[in-house]
Structures are given as C-alpha cells and as structure tokens.
Amino acid sequence: MYSLLIALLCAGTAVDAQALQQRQAGTTLTVDLSTTYQRIDGFGTSEAFQRAVQMSRLPEEGQRRALDVLFSTTNGAGLSILRNGIGSSPDMSSDHMVSIAPKSPGSPNNPLIYSWDGSDNKQLWVSQEAVHTYGVKTIYADAWSAPGYMKTNGNDANGGTLCGLSGAQCASGDWRQAYADYLTKYVEFYQESNVTVTHLGFINEPELTTSYASMRFSASQAAEFIRILYPTIQKSNLTYKPTIACCDAEGWNSQAGMLGALSSVNSMFGLVTAHAYTSQPGFSMNTPHPVWMTEAADLQGAWTSAWYSYGGAGEGWTWANNVYNAIVNGNASAYLYWIGAQTGNTNSHMVHIDANAGTVEPSKRLWALGQWSRFVRPGARRVAVSGASGSLRTAAFRNEDGSVAVVVINSGGDAAVNVRLASSSSADQQPASAKAWATDNSRAIEEIQASFADGVATVNVPSRSMTTVVLYPAADA
C-alpha cells in the first residue's frame, strides 16, 4: 500500500512538472477584463427561400439531426440567431417565398388581404424549434421586397421601388403605410404562433436588382420609410416591439456609405446590418448602433466539407478567419452565414441535405462558426487580450455567466498556449477551471486536454486549427 502511494505521488509530481514545463515554454495570453469592446449578440444563419421546406422533407431523424447541428450547444454549432425571409411572391413556385398578402386590395386605401398559412415557407417551424427546443432568443425577419402591387415595376422581382417614396410615384398611389402595416402584421402572426421577432428589416441589398425578390432603395429613401415604419410598430398591439434594422447592403463599404443619410433617424432604428459580398468587414462603422454581418457565403464554389486544403473560399479555415475579421477588425456584434442547411452542391450553405438518402452532412464551415457560437454566447462582451505570437490570432470575450472564452486561430505548428487573466482582475473574476475545444482537419469542436493550475490554463493548440479555451468561475467549477 505504501509503495502504491509513493508511486501515485511520484506520478502526480511528474504530471505537475510536465505541465509546469509546458507552461514555461508556451505563449502566454493575458486577458484584460477592464478593457471592453462591443457586445456580442450572437452567430447565426437563415433557412429562407424554402430551404426550411427542404429541411422539413427529411425523415424525422434527419430533421432532428439538421436542427441539432445548427442550434444545439452540446453537439452542434450552438447558433443563436435565425434570419427569416419575409415573403413577397404571389406563390411558392421555384423557391419563392410566398407573401402573407399575395393579392392586391386594389388601392393602398383598402385593407390588405392577408393569407396566413401558419407555415411561412416552413420558416415558422424552424423558428419554433430554434426558440422552444434550443433556446434561441433572436429572430431577425427581413424582407427582400414588398409585394409587387406596392412597387413601381408591379413585380416583387427585378428591382423596382416602393410606390410613394421620393422619386417613386405610381398611378396606384402611395403604398408606404401599407408596406409598414404589412411588415408589422408579419411580426404579429409570429407572436400569435409563440415566436417573438426581435429584429425587423424592410430591405435586402437595396443597391442590387435581381431576377428574384429585390427592391431598390437609396439611403435617404430608407430613412424616409423608417419614419413611417417606426411609429407603425410603436402604435401596434405587438407585445414586443422589434428593433428596426437597416439596410443589409451588399457589402460592408456600401452599408457604411448609407449611414450619413440614416443619421437623421438614429432614434428610430437600432441595428445596422451589412453583407460581405462586394466588400468584407475591415473597419468599425461610424454609428451609435450595433452592427451585424448578416449574410456571407462562398456562392460559387462546389460543395466541400473540408477544414483546410489550400485556403479555398469554402474551407472552414477560411471562415474561421472571416468571422475573426468581422468581430475584431469590423467590431461586428453578430455574424451570420447565408444558409444553414439545404440540398445542392455549392458552398452557399453549411450543412448538405441529401434528399434521396434523407441524411445531412455538416461542413467545417459550420464547425468554424460553432467554435465562436458555442462558447461566445449572446450578451458576451469582447475584451482585450495580449501576448499572441505571429502565427496566432486571438480574441477574448466575457460571457454574462462570468466565463471567459478565448479564441485562438493558429496558422503555425502545434503551440503550447497559456491563458490567464490580468493581475488587475478582481478575486471574484478569477477562474477555477478551464476546458478547451478545437476544430481542424480531424476534429469538429472536439474537446482537447486543458490543464489548469494557479489560475492559468495551459493548452496544446493544434497546428492549423481554431481552438476555444474557456475559463470558468468558481460557481461553474
């Protein structure tokens, strides 16, 4: 018995010595909780344009698998924002999103003729699952266009502008108030279905004309419409008044260019939204509002589930860095990949649905986003972190529960990394334990070893990986 005790003590001493040696040899990252940046609202995706319909056609097991990999915080990416498309089309042909008022009432002075099917192109089902099964609290509803009868071109596709806006006069009259009523009614239908729409957008890529739902708006026209939409929402019977978002421009630079004209209605809208197609996030926008990167994807590449092969546009490694650039360099408060799950063989989505086999295949793009979303939860505050070497990109966040998540993107070889809080941190902020998860060519948010002693977490960060180290306070130890 005595010899066994001695052996165990020696083994423990050897392990402690090994951990100490690794800590002394590694890079030390120091998190300063007193230096704060933006609040993080979350990470997410969309199932617009009938992608939710595709998901609903899976066998029950496939449906659950698709929902799990998107929204579960234990075995999925833990996405916390769902972006829904507000339909404008007269029917569901092709992948069109059907309108909640597909038939013209004949005049903007007549009440709209609503036709709510309790499905919303199956987006309501996905929303209900996200909210009630997985605890998602942020639903962003965004319209690509008004119904065609409200527009200058009489069509919800091919551009056109909302009748009644400055420079957009129509023989049928001024449809601005009708469109505001339409959007508010959509939110009401969701509330009646026990889903709260928290954010509401009225345009998408307003500088672009497409053969599908699209509508042109200038920045001044957007401000003009916000002056109508805001009081409409406030005077409504909605139990929760959604925050107005604007304007989902095609690129970061384009959206930044709209902010001057929007400043006159800063008190009426509360969220700036931008895409990353024509320009990527690379700077902080000059606005008092949080900024979300609400749509980005590799739209052209053939489907790949790879983490890293050659740095291709659809690889998970690329998207780990894209999100980093938006959060750290662009000061974004949220990041959304275009589509979550769908059929087809492009990288426009993160999860591939095989309709014939009834199966789903997550890509490493999903797990890259999940390395953020699983551990940087809504309400987290980005904080300062220092000490990274040339091959490491780092970002740190303090969650509302007191845990601290440190993201490490490693472009070099295996690296011993120590994570600690700055000495200025108060006693109640000090961590009591740590865990780490990594994604690379062989892992998908897989827990890896993290030793913890004297307030310092030590992790061997794999080469060409994204690793998230989480420091837990005593209550979570």
From Swiss-Prot:
Sample GO molecular function, one term: glucosylceramidase activity
Temperature behavior of the protein's activity: Optimum temperature is 50 degrees Celsius.
pH-dependence annotation: Optimum pH is 4.0.
Xref: InterPro entries: 6GAL-like (IPR039514), GH30_C (IPR033452), Glyco_hydro_30 (IPR001139), Glyco_hydro_b (IPR013780), Glycoside_hydrolase_SF (IPR017853)
Keyword Hydrolase: yes
Positions annotated as glycosylated: N194, N237, N331
Regulation: Activity is enhanced by 10 mM Co(2+), Cu 2(2+) and Mn(2+) to levels as high as 44%. Partial inhibition of activity from 5 to 15% is observed in the presence of the following compouinds at a centration of 10 mM (from higher inhibition to lower): EDTA > Mg(2+) > urea, Zn(2+) > Fe(3+).
Record keywords, A-Z: Glycoprotein, Hydrolase, Secreted, Signal
Family: Belongs to the glycosyl hydrolase 30 family.
Record's protein name: GH30 family xylanase
GN (gene name): Xyn30A
